[in-house]
């Protein structure tokens, strides 16, 4: 613009600068230290973000509705996502933020994404290596805290959905420096010990990214991938995602959902998959159509939204100025009132206080006289009533003594006549009680002996003593119960009463037919 150009109004120049900023800095990411933080009753946040060399004012509209669980304060180091604009009434440029991340959380999120990409590239999250859940799982290993609500939720769901199930709990800490190592050791324990577990559930309640960080450790991811037992990850709430979720064979949104998943049959899986497919397709179409309409709507009204934000910021500044003005006026009138009070107290208040003192003295004297008169009357009345009550009490006492003497004589006669009868009844009841107790004890001993004999007959070790044996595969991963699983030259581990032996299969017959 040359010197000879016609002058323009300040508002026109400001609008031009605003358009340039918003066009060239539509999306910016700024990091720095917060200062002058002010959260208004409207829910909007105003602040300044600074470093050692510069300061930038900013606003975050509707902050409280988006970040209701945490309030920033002066000195917090944050990362802001937003756009640059100009607040015209003050002629200052500012950032209008739409996302805020505290620095510590930002570092963890960055570390999470880097580790996720690296492990995914190494194949740890490959869907092809995930193991299917067994249909009708009945023995379930649960790795979680033994004292939290998580284990109770899992047991409650399993009790409702499964008629027969067995839960083997491996207690671990689910937060802190040692949590990942303890969970990894639990996975290794279930894999190394033949306990017949069909599936494992790793569970924890919700929390912040710091609380759930143990489930992002590389050690735990590798233990999950190496497990031969299918693992369900149920960590946090539905919106929480950890590396444990990506590495596990199945991810459940909550611990209760994990218990529901592990109890499902294959028919239920197929039916739910079909229902989910129909639901996703239907809602995806609706969602895309709605988002297209919403995008068109906001494109038309984008200019009006910016105007609303400017007006809202002006309103917040005006409200703050009015509040400061009201406080100033209140302080001024407090001082004036104190001054008037000092003036009045010097003359009028002195006379009023003297008159009140005289009235108080006269009133106290009158009250004392009244009290003395009433006290004298009450003493006389009390003495008269006390004498009458004493005479009545003496009369009733003598009458009660006469009645008590008569009742005592009658009671002695009644006791003497019924004592013999009661003694005979007591002897009879004692005999009946002794017989009943002896009969119940005899039946209880017989039942206990029968239970012991039944338990002894069901003990696998006792079965081995009768000449039977148990067959396992060579590595003792599973019990061999069918000849179909054997072939010639297989090595089989035989468990006998007093030891084990490894044998080689020479021939196998099925239903009297020679297999080879």
UniProtKB/Swiss-Prot annotation:
One of its GO terms (biological process) is DNA catabolic process. InterPro entries: Exonuc_VII_L, Exonuc_VII_lsu_C, OB-fold_nuc-bd_dom. CDD domains: ExoVII_LU_OBF. Its EC number is 3.1.11.6. Keywords: Cytoplasm, Exonuclease, Hydrolase, Nuclease. The keyword Kinase does not apply. Its main location: cytoplasm. One of its GO terms (molecular function) is exodeoxyribonuclease VII activity. It is found in: Cytoplasm. GO terms for cellular component: cytoplasm; exodeoxyribonuclease VII complex. Pfam families: Exonuc_VII_L, tRNA_anti_2. It catalyses: Exonucleolytic cleavage in either 5'- to 3'- or 3'- to 5'-direction to yield nucleoside 5'-phosphates. Heterooligomer composed of large and small subunits. Belongs to the XseA family. Bidirectionally degrades single-stranded DNA into large acid-insoluble oligonucleotides, which are then degraded further into small acid-soluble oligonucleotides. NCBIfam families: xseA (TIGR00237). This is Exodeoxyribonuclease 7 large subunit. The lineage of its organism: Bacteria, Pseudomonadati, Chlamydiota, Chlamydiia, Chlamydiales. The gene is xseA.
């Amino acid at each position: 613009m040359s010197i000879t150009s016609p002058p323009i109004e300040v508002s026109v120049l400001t609008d031009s600068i605003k358009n340039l900023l918003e066009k060239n800095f539509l999306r910016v990411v700024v990091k720095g230290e917060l200062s002058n933080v002010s959260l208004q009753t409207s829910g909007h946040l105003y602040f300044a973000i600074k470093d050692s060399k510069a300061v930038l004012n900013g606003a975050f509209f509707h902050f409280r509705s988006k970040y209701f669980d945490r309030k920033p304060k002066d000195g917090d180091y944050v990362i802001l996502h937003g756009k640059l604009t100009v607040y015209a009434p003050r002629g200052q440029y500012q950032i209008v933020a739409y996302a805020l991340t505290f620095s510590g959380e930002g570092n963890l999120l960055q570390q999470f994404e880097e580790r996720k990409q690296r492990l995914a590239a190494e194949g740890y999250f490959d869907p092809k290596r995930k193991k299917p859940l067994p249909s009708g799982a009945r023995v379930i290993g649960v790795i979680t805290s033994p004292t939290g609500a998580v284990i109770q939720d899992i047991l409650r769901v399993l009790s409702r959905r499964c008629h027969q199930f067995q839960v083997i709990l491996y207690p671990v800490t689910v937060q802190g420096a040692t949590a990942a190592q303890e969970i990894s050791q639990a996975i290794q324990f279930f894999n190394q010990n033949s306990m017949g577990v069909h599936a494992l559930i790793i569970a924890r309640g919700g929390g912040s990214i710091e609380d759930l960080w143990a489930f992002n450790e590389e050690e735990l991811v590798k233990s999950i991938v190496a497990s031969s037992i299918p693992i369900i990850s149920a960590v946090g709430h539905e919106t929480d995602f950890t590396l444990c979720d990506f590495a596990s064979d199945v991810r459940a949104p909550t611990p209760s959902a994990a218990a529901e998943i592990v109890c499902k049959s294959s028919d239920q899986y197929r039916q739910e998959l079909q229902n989910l497919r129909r639901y996703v397709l239907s809602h995806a179409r609706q969602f895309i159509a709605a988002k297209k309409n919403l995008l068109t709507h906001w494109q038309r009204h984008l200019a009006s939204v910016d105007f609303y934000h400017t007006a809202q910021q002006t309103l917040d500044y005006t409200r703050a100025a009015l509040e400061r003005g009201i406080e100033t006026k209140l302080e001024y009138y407090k001082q004036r009132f104190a001054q008037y009070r000092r003036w009045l107290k010097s003359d009028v208040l002195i006379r009023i206080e003297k008159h009140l003192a005289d009235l108080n003295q006269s009133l106290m004297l009158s009250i004392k006289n009244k009290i003395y008169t009433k006290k004298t009357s009450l003493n006389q009345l009390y003495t008269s009533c006390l004498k009458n009550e004493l005479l009545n009490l003496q009369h009733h006492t003598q009458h009660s003594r006469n009645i008590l003497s008569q009742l005592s004589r009658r009671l002695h006669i009644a006791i003497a006549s019924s004592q013999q009868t009661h003694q005979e009844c007591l002897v009879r009841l004692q005999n009946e009680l002794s017989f009943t107790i002896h009969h119940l004890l005899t039946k209880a001993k017989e039942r206990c002996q029968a239970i012991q004999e039944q338990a002894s007959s069901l003990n696998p070790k006792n079965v081995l003593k009768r000449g039977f044996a148990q067959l396992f595969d060579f590595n003792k991963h599973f019990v061999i119960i069918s000849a179909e699983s054997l072939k010639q030259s297989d090595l089989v581990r035989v468990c006998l009463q007093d030891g084990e032996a490894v044998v080689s299969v020479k021939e196998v017959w099925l239903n009297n037919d020679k297999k080879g």
